Amino acid sequence: MADNNKKPAGLTEKKANRRGAARLAAVQALYQMDIAGAGINDIFAEFESHWLGNEVEGDTYLPAEAAFFRDVVSGVVRDQKKLDPLIDEALSKGWPLKRIEAILRAVLRAGAYELQHRKDVPGRVVVSEYVDVANAFVDREETGMVNAVLDQIGRQFRGDEFGRG
């Protein structure tokens, strides 16, 4: 039986899983900040002490790379005014970012941040990981939108990896 689990080149399984868990946690944290207006320090304290690597309401959350989680969340918060216009430009006409569900805004912002700033992670891995994160929350059509938007942003910031178009 073939192993269909795709791992990013150069990352150990443990590191890849910890980064994937960090991405999922970052999206959840950004969503909570967007919906509830929670502050970044409160979010860090809550997620690092109660969520990452713990059991919550019967679900066990994977241990996450805390530094990666913090970088994505703080980077999105710091750069949101620059990220949102990039995402708006990549979205279909008539669908500005403010009309997109809050969870998808969090996914797109985190993915756009990583594509722009985390050159240590291959761009295609970033897109694939955030499509997987989106898949945990929304249907296939919306994950297709996540793929298309992040691919377009990837071409802008990492044309050498994606091809310029």
Swiss-Prot record:
The gene is nusB. It comes from the Bacteria. This is Transcription antitermination protein NusB. PANTHER family: ANTITERMINATION NUSB DOMAIN-CONTAINING PROTEIN (PTHR11078:SF3), N UTILIZATION SUBSTANCE PROTEIN B-RELATED (PTHR11078). Belongs to the NusB family. One of its GO terms (biological process) is DNA-templated transcription termination. GO terms for molecular function: RNA binding. The keyword Membrane does not apply. Signal peptide: none annotated. Keywords: RNA-binding, Transcription, Transcription antitermination, Transcription regulation. One of its GO terms (cellular component) is cytosol. InterPro entries: NusB-like_sf, NusB_fam, NusB_RsmB_TIM44. Involved in transcription antitermination. Required for transcription of ribosomal RNA (rRNA) genes. Binds specifically to the boxA antiterminator sequence of the ribosomal RNA (rrn) operons.
